[in-house]
């Protein structure tokens, strides 16, 4: 175990916690409660930093920690909360009783972030589709305005990108299997490919 002397302070242990250290911290917090972790470290006799004590208690020692794999309901809640809050793991973990923010973050990074539909669900509400040629997100008129871009004339990005294929595409012309949103954004059904819209000659 490494010990480091900080200027004007006593030695601070680093590295793995020993079972006897866990017992000291657990016993002290159960007797005196949580509070100033640097003070807890000093009063309990542990030669650990306050942050180290806090994280050890929060992630490993507190009695209400839930162990075991995530349930489907917990997975679904993590995906929905991440879509709403982003990487604010402590807030997400607050909605999952017994789960720590560190556990939720690790679970997201190892299991959920790699799933294609979780990435899709995680896209901001204002990005509702992608152009079939560049795979760039199609932004809503409101989002373009907030970025200082034009409105109606810039809603035709997809139309301009199809022109070099020699197809006669006009704004407002009906195309099958394309959804029109109120803000003129086009959304393609991902079940169909480019050739479903434009057969190759």
From Swiss-Prot:
Mainly expressed in the trichomes of new leaves. Disulfide bonds: none annotated. The keyword Mitochondrion does not apply. One of its GO terms (biological process) is trichome differentiation. It is found in: Nucleus. GO terms for molecular function: DNA binding. Residues 9-61, 62-116 form the HTH myb-type domain. It comes from the Eukaryota. Residues 37-61, 89-112 bind DNA. Keywords: Developmental protein, DNA-binding, Nucleus, Repeat, Transcription, Transcription regulation. Residues 112-133 are annotated as: Disordered. Gene3D superfamilies: Homeodomain-like. GO terms for cellular component: nucleus. Induction: By auxin (IAA). Pfam families: Myb_DNA-binding. The keyword Lipoprotein does not apply. At least one of the two introns in the MYB82 gene is essential to the protein's trichome developmental function. The MYB-binding box (5'-TAAGCCAGTTATGTCT-3') located in the third exon of the MYB82 gene is required for MYB82 function in trichome initiation. Transcription activation factor positively regulating trichomes development. Has a function nearly equivalent to that of GL1 and can complement gl1 mutants. The N-terminal domain is necessary and sufficient for dimer formation. The C-terminal domain is responsible for the transcription activation function. Homodimer and heterodimer with GL1. Part of the WD40-bHLH-MYB complex. Interacts with BHLH012/MYC1 and BHLH042/TT8. Interacts (via N-terminus) with GL1 and GL3. This is Transcription factor MYB82. It comes from Arabidopsis thaliana (Mouse-ear cress). The lineage of its organism: Eukaryota, Viridiplantae, Streptophyta, Embryophyta, Tracheophyta.
């Amino acid at each position: 175990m490494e010990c480091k002397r900080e200027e004007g302070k006593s030695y601070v242990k680093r590295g793995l916690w020993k079972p006897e250290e866990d017992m000291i911290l657990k016993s002290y917090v159960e007797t005196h409660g949580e509070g100033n972790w640097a003070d807890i470290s000093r009063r309990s006799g542990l030669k650990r930093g306050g942050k180290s004590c806090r994280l050890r208690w929060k992630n490993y020692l507190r009695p209400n920690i839930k162990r075991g794999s995530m349930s489907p309901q917990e997975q679904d809640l993590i995906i929905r909360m991440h879509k709403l809050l982003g990487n604010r793991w402590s807030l997400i973990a607050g909605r999952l009783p017994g789960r720590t923010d560190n556990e939720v973050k690790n679970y997201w990074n190892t299991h959920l972030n790699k799933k294609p539909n979780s990435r899709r669900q995680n896209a901001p509400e204002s990005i509702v589709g992608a152009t079939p040629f560049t795979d760039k997100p199609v932004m809503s008129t409101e989002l373009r305005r907030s970025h200082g871009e034009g409105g109606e004339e810039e809603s035709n990005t997809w139309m301009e990108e199809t022109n070099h294929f020699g197809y006669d595409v006009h704004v407002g012309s009906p195309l099958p299997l394309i959804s029109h949103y109120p803000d003129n954004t086009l959304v393609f059904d991902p079940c169909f490919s480019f050739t479903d819209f434009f057969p190759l000659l």
